[in-house]
């Protein structure tokens, strides 16, 4: 398979490598679509891995089950899945009350090889942590890669309870800022103000 492998800051090489083996009680996902997050750009242009190279980034992953362990009955070959990128347990009190950033049992997702490749491993731990979601057939796969950033926007607006008739000021008209603007309108905000120093981004937001 091919993968975009990071060997150091700004040193990304597309190479042919061996396809990973299916893990016990896990599966192999054929990557169908993947987002390019701002954190990916930051990570690939800095020493984010602290010298632990080579590494494959990419965490906004949608794919199709290519191989699956016989002991993983929840999914089947051909299923289209979205992989939640973080490694929160989603079971502790912090996670269940909407504060997964304070997870009491976090894993080390940054050490896992990512989705800038033809295939990616999905472990039994990820499945048990409810980090794998089956997609309905009618969902656009490119749009589905944005599930995690959009869920972050939703959680933010839930926390501050944006509702009908509110006025909302959003600082920054990048992708997340635009998500916030759209979400605020959906929630009934009467006035959405965006503050941005980049004219191109502001025009895009309009």
Model feature map: region roles:
Residues 1-61, 120-122, 126-129:
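Short N-terminal strand-loop motif that marks the start
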Residues 20-34, 47-96, 136:
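Glycine-rich beta-strand-centered segment in the early N-terminal region that forms part
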Residues 91-171:
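NAD(P)H dinucleotide-binding glycine-rich loop of Rossmann-like/cofactor-binding domains
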Residues 158, 181-186:
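Surface-exposed amphipathic alpha-helices with a cationic face
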Residues 170, 185-206:
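Adenosine-nucleotide cofactor-binding segment
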Residues 177-178:
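N-terminal Rossmann-fold NAD(P) dinucleotide-binding loop
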